[in-house]
Amino acid sequence: CACLVGSEMCIRDRSKMEENKVMNIELTPEMFEKLDDSKKNSEKIAYESKTYIADAWNRFKKNKLALIGLCFLLVMAIGCIFVPIFSSYTYDGQNMANTFAGPSMDHIFGTDRFGRDVLVRIMYGGRISLAVGFSAAIISLCVGVTYGAIAGYAGGKVDMIMMRIVDALYSIPDMLYLIMITVVLGSNFQSIIIGICISSWMGMARQVRAQVMTLKEQEFSLAAFVLGASKKRILLKHLIINSMGPIIVSFSMLVPSSIFYEATLGFLGIGLSAPQASWGTLANDARAMISSQPLQVVWPILAICLTMLALNFIGDGLGDALDPKKK
């Protein structure tokens, strides 16, 4: 035992002596190497500062289908807006000597039973269909966000009463709203938008309410309340702003559904009256000739399908781009 203790003490003494030697080494300038300018930032972690929108756009661009859908929608919108510049034909100009003409250089999609250019009518119809879709979606967005945010933030009996009203309205089929409104107010642009809005805002209200109820218990919301922020400021500046991701995605899904509702009304014969034409009314006009002139039905239905597909691709891309969990 005594030998073991003695050996341990010797080892400790040697280690202390080595440490003292290291500490007593004199440092001179020749022992150091001057760092070059090229190596000064070698250990610096450099990254580009990006805003939330820029970061979301970079992720959105990586989704090829979403980017294709956006390009298609832009081309369709430009064509619908500037069709009078691109073509000398009008949507109601008739030429009875050139009815049911096939696709050609003069008439790319052919002509209808009155000799009207089908492509021009589809472009003019796209004006109405896209205008109805985006207008109804924007109004539904405003109503649904306001209603759902108030219900979610108020809570208690206010929330219960407001959401029971939504449940009661939600139990009625959407098409019944549309048919009732168009029958009462007439088949015009305004009545179709009102009918779509009445049937579309409730889903948005439910989603916003769920988001607000979750966010109002978060630390940043409670901190704003403790610091004396008003309820209006908390609701607008903190809760709704932090819910914009799901809101934008829902809005992108509202647009194709609104276009579909308008097209359904037109196909049922209770849409816009002639000579105005949307994609749905164009398909309805050609329905009687589906056996003899199938292309007359194919073109407007193809425009509806491609536009809705593009909008759904955009919605999926926005959902991935705005989701913080997928960064």
Give the location of each predicted region:
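Transmembrane alpha-helix boundary and packing residues in multipass membrane permease domains
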Residues: 76, 149, 178-183, 192, ...
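Glycine-rich helix-loop "coupling/hinge" segments at transmembrane-helix boundaries
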Residues: 181-185, 196, 211-212, 260-303, ...
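Loop-to-transmembrane-helix entry motif
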Residues: 63-67, 122-125, 129-133, 165, ...
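Gly/Trp-centered helix-boundary motif
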Residues: 14-145, 149, 156-157, 258, ...
